[in-house]
């Protein structure tokens, strides 16, 4: 059943800044409500089928029933969100995001780790279980709207060897890293969108698979030098930079500089008394500068000469 009807959102406040989720906020023992909060606010779990309910179960991979699971070592706080599909239960889990960057998002850079916590070779040792990744720009829940599957982000059972039983999804032998940049999007400022993982019910017995270390980075590929992403007033005095960034601010602000690959290359704190940041050590090229100035998140592209 649906975990929540409030549909909290994960706010994305700056381009090229990654949102990350490690699922360690999941319970590490017993059963818990699928209404997620705290560090998992904005995420939802949906079970369908005759055995669906409003709880998920903590497991080391020993559980065999169709269910949604918080996987991890016994009593460990290092968790992963997963499931076992069956003929009477299917599980979806995902999140709603809101574009609060002040600019159109046309790309989403996605990565996560697929983990194998239980393996059952009864269906055959050549058939892989699967979790699909999908996104929707018009959904209002995990089941509404039009969804697009991303083949490059499909997770399949990592290791098909051995006898039936528990696997250690934290072991490299049972983990698969997946990443892809979704292009051609048109997510306007203020718009929401959803992502979800869907556990596929394969023919025969299913494995216990999970997702961990999820990352989503909003991007805009069309910004030119000097484009203001958010704020009617230009917060940078200079967008053609030699050695120093000069800001307009009335108070303290945290400043971050990213290269065109989305990597953080410089961070600093500025104030009205010292509103300059030394970037002399950065190579020539384009960068994106983000900051929280006077309570508003702003971002702008610069050229380092």
Regions found by a protein language model. Give the residues of each.
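Terminal, low-complexity interaction segments
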Residues: 10, 88-89, 102, 114-115, ...
